[in-house]
């Protein structure tokens, strides 16, 4: 299954990010190349993803589900499976709020015992234009030091950091120095372009640079690199200029 995406045409593009920002980037990139690889953050701790992560001890699947959906084509097959993958159950019971795609990814992870093979199988089912990979094989936590009205505090968790109203002074991932997904390193090394963002700056973009192997391959790759910033500032980047993002 790891070889099913060879032979694509167009430039080799790797997109870093997570959530809605990465989804928007992938929706545009798939119109320009079929050789696109999404490298997705694995620190989500909210909603359906957070519940599955806590209960099963797996990578949070939600951002990968969104990336897979974004790479579906515009035909009936692609759009039907996109909608099915994104479908959320509404009930009074424990299934409430779960996305079907999260459950499908979880089932394939348990079946294969390996995340990349499972994601490739979902990609084949959806006939996506590209590939989706986790940035690390280990679920991560985000921890930030935030300067707010009450002084400097430490905030832990993707949701908590993303909704923080203070100025983020420092951000880290736990565990420290996590392993990068091997296939992601190869994709960056062989890429023509690497795109960072758009998305939540401290919780979807910066975490990729806190994985030492990813940071190093991004530094040494011969690929051109582009940074895409959000059109509107989020709470975690309120008051930051474009230059502030790259200092």
Q: Where are the model-predicted features located?
A:
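Gly/lys/ser-thr-rich phosphate-binding loops in alpha/beta enzymes
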Residues: 1-62
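C-terminal functional extensions of proteins
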Residues: 2, 242-247
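A short helix->loop->beta-strand "cap" motif at the edges of active sites that frequently abuts
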Residues: 33-34, 220-225
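Electropositive, gly/pro-rich neighborhoods at or near active sites that engage anionic ligands
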Residues: 41-166, 172
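Active-site glycine-rich loop that binds ribose-phosphate moieties when present
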Residues: 170-185, 209-210
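Catalytic-core regions built around general acid/base machinery
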Residues: 187, 210-221
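An anion/phosphate-binding loop that grips the pyrophosphate of nucleotide cofactors and donors
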Residues: 191
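Glycine/threonine-rich flexible loop motifs
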Residues: 201-212
């Amino acid at each position: 299954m790891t070889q099913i995406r060879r032979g694509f045409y167009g430039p080799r593009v790797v997109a870093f990010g997570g959530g809605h920002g990465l989804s928007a980037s992938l929706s545009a990139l798939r119109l320009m190349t079929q050789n696109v690889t999404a490298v997705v953050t694995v620190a989500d701790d909210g909603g359906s993803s957070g519940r599955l992560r806590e209960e099963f001890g797996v990578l949070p699947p939600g951002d990968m589900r969104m990336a897979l959906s974004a790479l579906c084509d515009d035909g009936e097959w692609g759009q039907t499976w996109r909608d099915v993958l994104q479908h959320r159950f509404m009930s009074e019971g424990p299934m409430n709020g779960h996305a079907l795609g999260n459950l499908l990814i979880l089932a394939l992870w348990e079946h294969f015992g390996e995340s990349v093979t499972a994601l490739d199988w979902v990609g084949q089912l959806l006939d996506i234009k590209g590939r989706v990979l986790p940035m690390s094989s280990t679920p991560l936590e985000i921890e930030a030091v935030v300067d707010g009205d009450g002084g400097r505090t430490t905030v832990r968790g993707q949701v908590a950091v993303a909704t923080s109203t203070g100025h983020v002074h420092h951000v880290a991932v736990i565990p420290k120095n996590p392993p990068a997904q091997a296939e992601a390193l190869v994709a960056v090394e062989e890429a023509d372009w690497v795109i960072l963002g758009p998305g939540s700056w401290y919780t979807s973009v910066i975490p990729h640079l806190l994985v030492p192997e990813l940071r190093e391959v991004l530094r040494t790759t011969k690929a051109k690199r582009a940074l895409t910033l959000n059109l509107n500032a989020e709470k975690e980047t309120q008051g930051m200029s474009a230059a502030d993002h790259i200092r």
